């Protein structure tokens, strides 16, 4: 497991009364390359409020370079910001 806490550009869909649903995101790697990752499935969404700051935690997986990758995305409600928080290996 790697904790990244890396900001990502996200394309998401919003429905009335539900948290935003991630569809795909772009991430920039250390070498400067930019990769688009399609969110294949959201397995679970948790609503958490650490220190009074509401956010949603998404447990997802995607097929990346012919491998299944499990990861955790976070959406910070007050900041309207997405983050790739953790990658499970």
Give the positions of each predicted feature.
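Cysteine-centric segments in proteins
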Residues: 1-89
């Amino acid at each position: 497991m790697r904790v990244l806490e890396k900001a990502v550009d996200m394309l998401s869909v919003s429905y009335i009364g539900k948290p935003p649903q991630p569809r795909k995101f772009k991430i920039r790697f250390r070498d400067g390359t930019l990769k688009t990752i399609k969110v294949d499935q959201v397995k679970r969404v948790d609503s958490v409020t650490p220190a009074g700051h509401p956010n949603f935690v998404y447990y997802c997986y995607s097929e990346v370079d012919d491998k299944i990758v499990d990861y955790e995305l976070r959406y910070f409600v007050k900041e309207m910001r997405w983050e790739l928080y953790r990658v499970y290996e």
